[in-house]
Every structure is written in structure tokens, then in C-alpha cells.
Amino acid sequence: MSALHQTQSTYKGAPGRALWVSTGAFTVCFAIWTIFSIIGVRIKDELGLSEAEFGLLIGMPILTGSLVRIVLGIWTSRYGGRLVYTITMLAAALATFLLAYATTYPQMLLAGLGVGLAGGSFAVGVAYVSPFFPPEKQGTALGIFGAGNVGAAVTKFLAPFVLVAFGWQAVAQVWAAALLLTAVVFWLSTEDDPQFRARRDVGAPRKSFLSEFEPLKNVQVWRFSLYYFFSFGGFVALALWLPRYLVGVYGFDIETAGMIAAAYSIPGSIFRAYGGALSDKLGARKIMYAMFAVSAVATAILSIPAGGAGSAMPILVTPMVFVVVTFVLGFVMSLGKAAVYKHIPVYYPSHVGAVGGIVGMMGGLGGFVLPIAFGFLKDVTGLWSSCFMLLFVIVAVSMVWMNVSIRQIKREADRGLPAGALAR
């Protein structure tokens, strides 16, 4: 069989259906997860919310969707991704539909908890999809799945039209109906993953719930989490922060700033699939080194002090330079997101759910915490560019930690230590 035929056949049949249907489902889930980015503005006006209340409202799904990832990942290992993914989508669809009937702020927050389940679907999808593919194809497969992040752009582009025509409640109802339909299609067109099916067929006892957390004792898991905190959390944070930055520093109108932010989000999501393919071909470690090197240079350039429009401080980074460098940063972040998840099934093939869940949780928390940190630094320093100074510090720490750990792994390998000792 030719190499080309082998590659093509890998993405056909049950593996192909699992990958493409899961990716479509994750795209819809991500669109649901970010629904407050559009309807939240109208809700804020209707309820007369303060800025703090508004921030909590739009952040609630991001926070809960991040925290629930580790639990959903473990449940996927125990009960199978097909079942857990379907139930997660049904629960999120119900919460999104009920959101349309919420009339008070506490009700909105409660609905936001349920909407956040859609964001937790990432951990389910990773644990479900990876067993369908051999190790040399998992980077590409998980990169394609992760490209479902583009669902955020779907909401940004389509939801405003529905909102203007029919109101924010209609957005919630239509998005809920889409997720319900997606859950039905997913259940009817997929099957259980090979690992879960094998355990079920031989009647293998389930691991205890606590044993699922065993890999979390490895420092390596938390190192991967820091990488994803930057590559995914930093990417999401910049997507949220860029409109405010462009308006505050360069005086752009909100429409232009919003379109630039949307243009930053779309390729940044799609190129994740390319990052997975590169990780399979060149190795995830090389991709991580490249991401950190380029990110360090980019964040250093963007850290050049900028006081903003109306400030006496000169703006040394022109709008064109800023947009180009930011897009380069977003591109390498997308490659890095895929490279991080290429590592997980290689190092932890029996704990993809738990490890993928904790890494995904930390990345999601980055998307929640970093915008708050950006605002705090702006208030304290008066510099808009302080957000990139923070990102530079995170990149530097990650790069040093990675380099030290890899050197330690190589030294231990040269001494012939067992594989378990290499989890640094």
C-alpha cells in the first residue's frame, strides 16, 4: 500500500467520522461557549449592569468551561467519549435555551454555568478522538479537532445579525437548537473509541476515580499546562483584549478594531491543524522551541512602551507593524497549541482524559485570568503595552523551564534510567 493511500485511509471510515464529526461538534460548542461576547452587551444595557457585573457575566462560561474540563476528561476515560460528549452537548443546549428565559442577573449567571459546559467539550473530544489514530497521526488529528476554535468567529460574524433582527433571546434559542441537532447527529454517526470498546468487551474493571489523577503528580504535566496557559490562554486573552488595545492606543473605531480582532482569531484557529501536521512530521519539541523563540521576539517588540492615544509618550510601534507582529504571534501560538497536545497521548496514553483535562483547564483559565491581569497592569503602569510585557515573562519562564527539563531528560537517558524517571 502506498504512503499516500495509507494517509488517505487513516482519515476514512470510523476514524474519519469520529474526527470530522467531533470537529464539527466542537465548532458548534465553541460558538455556544462564546455567545456572551455578543449578547452580553445587550443584556448589560437591559439590566443596567456595572462593568464588574458585566465582566463576571461574560467570564462565567469561560471559567466554568475551564474548570469542568478535568472532570469531563476523566469521565470520558471511564464511560466513553461518545456518551460523555453527547450528554455534555445536550446539557449545554438546555442551559443555552433556558438562558433565553432568564430575566434577572442571578438567573443569567446560573445559565452561564450551564453554557460553560460547551467549553468543557474540548477535553472530551481530545480523549475521544486520539485513540482512533496511531501516534504518528495524532498530532494532525488533534490539530484538526482543535481548529473547532473557529466557532468563536462564527458567533462574532453571525450572532449580531440574529440579535439585530430578532433580539438576543433568539440568538440563545437558535444556538441551542443548533447544538441539540449537533448532539443527535454526533450520536447517530459515531461509535465508541477503540480503547473504551476494548475495555468494555473484555470486562476490564474501571480504574478508581482517584487513580485517574495519578499522572498529575508528575511535574511534566504542569509544565505542559504552563505551555498551554500561554499558547491557548494567551491567544484567547489577546482575542478579547485587542479591540480595546487598538482603540486605546491607535484611536481606531470599534468596528475596525473588532474586524481586526476577528481576522486575528480565524487563521489562528485554522492553523492549529497545520501545527498538528508539523508536530507529526518534525516532532512536537521542535515546534515548541520555534513557538517560544518567535513569541519571545514578538512580545519583546510589542512591549515597547505605548501610552495610548492622547498621551505625550510617542508611539514607536506603528499600527501596521503592530498588526503584522500580532498576527505572527497568533500564528505561532496556534502551532504551539497543537504541539502541546501532541505530547499528551505519547507520554500518557492511558490517561489522555485526565492529563488533557488539566492542561485544557489551565489553558482556559489563562483566557479568563490574563485579560484581568492586562487591565490591572494598564491601571497600575499606565502603559497599554504592559500586557505584552507580561506575556514576554511567561514565554521566558516557559522556554527556560523547557530547556532545563529537556537537558535533564537527556542526561538521565544517557545514564540509562527507566522511562518513568524521565517525566520531568
Question: What label would you give each PLM region?
Answer:
Residues 34, 62-70, 120, 152-154, ...:
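Residue-level signature of mid-helix packing/kink "hotspots" within the transmembrane helices
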Residues 67-106:
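Conserved MFS/SLC helix-loop-helix module at the cytosolic interface between two early adjacent transmembrane helices
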Residues 111-148:
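Cytoplasmic helix-loop-helix junction between adjacent transmembrane helices
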